[in-house]
Amino acid sequence: MKTDLLACRHIGVNKADAEVMLRKIGVASLDELIDKTIPANIRLKAPLALPAPMTEYEFARHIAELAGKNKLFTTYIGMGWYNTITPAVIQRNVFENPVWYTSYTPYQTEVSQGRLEALMNFQTAVCDLTAMPLANCSLLDEATAAAEAVTMMYGLRSRNQQKAGANVVFIDENIFPQTLAVITTRAIPQDIEIRTGKFRDLEFTDDLFACVLQYPNANGNAEDYREFTEKAHTANCKVAVAADILSLALLTPPGEWGADIVFGTTQRLGTPMFYGGPSAGYFATRDEYKRNMPGRIIGWSKDKYGKLCYRMALQTREQHIKREKATSNICTAQALLATMAGFYTVYHGQEGIRNIASRIHSITVFLEKSISKLGFKQVNKQYFDTLRFILPDSVSAQQIRTIALSKEVNLRYFDNGDVGLSIDETTDVAAANILLSIFAIAAGKDFQKVDDIPEATIISEELKRQTPYLTHEVFSKYHTETEMMRYIKRLDRKDISLAQSMISLGSCTMKLNAAAEMLPLSCAEFMCMHPLVPEDQAAGYRELIHNLSEELKVITGFAGVSLQPNSGAAGEYAGLRTIRAYLESIGQGHRNKVLIPASAHGTNPASAIQAGFTTVTCACDEHGNVDMDDLRAKAEENKDDLAALMITYPSTHGIFETEIVEICQIIHACGAQVYMDGANMNAQVGLTNPGFIGADVCHLNLHKTFASPHGGGGPGVGPICVAEHLVPFLPGHGLFGNSQNEVSAAPFGSAGILPITYGYIRMMGAEGLTMATKTAILNANYLAACLKDTYGIVYRGANGFVGHEMILECRKVYEETGISENDIAKRLMDYGYHAPTLSFPVHGTLMIEPTESESLSELDNFVLTMLTIWNEIQEVKNGEADKEDNVLINAPHPEYEVVSDQWEHCYTREKAAYPIESVRENKFWVNVARVDNTLGDRKLLPTCYGCFD
């Protein structure tokens, strides 16, 4: 392999290191290890047919060429996407900072205080702007937030409504079309009927349980919904409102006129359009609905010494605990983008946000008055940033389109011939003059250029916001770049990311996110593209999307790909909806059961329920495999109604099951489909694939296998790949003329981060990707060999090897000493490591996945850490350490505790803080001691204003 290829930088183990590791494992070669790990009958016979790998320099030139094919016109299409200004201090110190983008979802509270605080800022900003008491820390986008709102309101129906079968949701006709489409996809399998029309004409019938409104609406008109909301509540109907978050700086917020749920996108709070995504959806509601709310919620708590801290609250609602009974299948959301939006509000504060909104509104008012003087009729009576014009008889929309394109401007063109425009943060006087000139030329009239646009408003007193927002001190302290930079740095020092050390989370694949893959995201031609521009303006994006889709087909062995799902859970849902659509097309729509192994990730049953299926659990045997007898029995018992099997491969137990082909055959013999969860695809690439094994559909986690970063809990991409017979049923998009099974607002989902995976595949090539897979398996087996004689490995494959991850036995330790897997996880923090995956898929264990990116020296340091912790456990077992006062149950040890004048433990400060030599050179200090989880759930405080009595 050439030394200037990415594979040499991405893969952490060199040839000499591998030989040392193979000797420890007990095999003669890497090929022998792979042959003994992966069943021979599923091994690919030929290398992946992918383009030759590019060097980093060659890829930089190639991606620049693609970017150059994108034409950056000034776009006023709106419809949920707006140009914005990302403050450089946020772009440089957050968006482009690996400390922020390589961190994991903040389950481990003590090593996540920085991003938890940043997400708390986001929640507070959302609550303030919407005037609601509770918000989560992001959803995937506005459209999926709308679908979640409808599902939540359906679950909140009164007992009488449920008995009466109330199943109708009213959606105002002036909602964004992509939002209606995604709601429709979600509603159909849940037997929710959608009724659309004008909100003023609605008759509140007994079968109605909820209403969804847009504010301002899709035309840009800001309606006064107060009377309607009162009527809805009188009729026992909930009201959800899709609100433009920036408009709420000027408009009366929905929380003040009775909304039950307020949702939308925070894209215009400093997040580029990225050809549709990613951006952080938001979701706010009433406090009494907190246990019904989808998504993650950050709340206050205290550590064991009483220090205030943050944590993820009310996790018992979520899929990883409640599984099929969860409030939602949401897992990965948009944490990095929510963090950026939160910092945007912190940086600008109340005055800055109001000034931005007022400037946008003033320019809109100026344009309405000026264009109306040219003979155009503007239809919106109350508006924030959007105008819709009826054209005079002498002017056609095509004339305006031609003139606009000649000036490199995109406007919105309605089906009836009207023309619209939405002003944004980047619009200045010069841009306003160009817009005015387009309409003047079309009308054949002169116009007067202006040098300044005065502040103005047309918002009525009834709709004008009177209440303050962003009043917490965090929104007023950091308005200089110096202070903002230091604040961001203070927060990132509190967190463990890949910039600190290996993150060995099983089933999460925390691999390198190479700088060469990340750089294109900061390119304006990729950042500033609206998803609904004419196709020729997005030629570079379209070529990249086509190339990436073809490469994913090759890697998975499938015939079709959809890049639309915004997360792995969204991919599961999309794949199951695709299966359902196919079954309905062949007269098998009655099939409504999905078989799921007991070891499956919680998103599997949650997604199946969301897609309208019921779940049947299949047992696993003592070796961690699917119990074949139970599988056959369950498949036979349910064969007439069986729609699919959902199975992860290699399994969540970390092994390649030898009967996987037979498993697929059993399911197909019942007339059902095989859904392969691609969470563990990092152990397949180049060696086997779902299509070759016999699956019909799989989703991929680009933020796992394909090098896109986790971002502290998103963004992710969960594309689905399908066999030939399922291709016609893949998600489409109504705005592109193919409305079916839409699962996200944008046609290509989070298109803005696709260059990462594209770069990974293009620079690794077939040989590099295959070597990455082999090395991931090598690294996992090396750790297993090093730790098997102490902790023990719960499951191994047929020949005694693990796949790319392993489950470490901790249950016996607990029985003998009272030291739990959680204590071990917390103690790892003192050594500078993030915890592995706790108690999944087996309670009382740790699941470890090292990935191919880690070097032998890092693996050895982790082994030394785990063995030192093992010795600490033995000290407790042998009575050398106090069972009630030892380094494990007291872990982690924050700096403030170690340097305190009060030290009452029976072990030394040095043992607590510097247990091995490497820690002295690279000490990570947790910011808080062990956090009180019960307190944080007992009293949920989801904003910066919260405090404990």
UniProtKB/Swiss-Prot annotation:
Residues where N6-(pyridoxal phosphate)lysine is found:
704
Enzyme class of the recorded protein, top EC level: oxidoreductase
Any one of the GO CC terms? cytosol
Asked if the keyword Ribosomal protein belongs to this entry, the reply reads: no
User: Which cofactors does this protein require?
Assistant: pyridoxal 5'-phosphate
UniProt KW Hydrolase keyword: no
Which Pfam families does the UniProt record give? GcvP2_C, GDC-P
> Which molecular-function annotation in GO is an example for this chain?
pyridoxal phosphate binding
Catalytic activity as recorded in UniProt: N(6)-[(R)-lipoyl]-L-lysyl-[glycine-cleavage complex H protein] + glycine + H(+) = N(6)-[(R)-S(8)-aminomethyldihydrolipoyl]-L-lysyl-[glycine-cleavage complex H protein] + CO2
The UniProt keywords, alphabetically, are: Oxidoreductase, Pyridoxal phosphate
Instruction: Give the EC number.
Output: 1.4.4.2
Role summary = The glycine cleavage system catalyzes the degradation of glycine. The P protein binds the alpha-amino group of glycine through its pyridoxal phosphate cofactor; CO(2) is released and the remaining methylamine moiety is then transferred to the lipoamide cofactor of the H protein.
Family of this protein? Belongs to the GcvP family.
Q: State the oligomer form and interacting partners.
A: The glycine cleavage system is composed of four proteins: P, T, L and H.
Protein name (Swiss-Prot/TrEMBL): Glycine dehydrogenase (decarboxylating)
Q: Which organism is it from?
A: Bacteroides fragilis (strain YCH46)
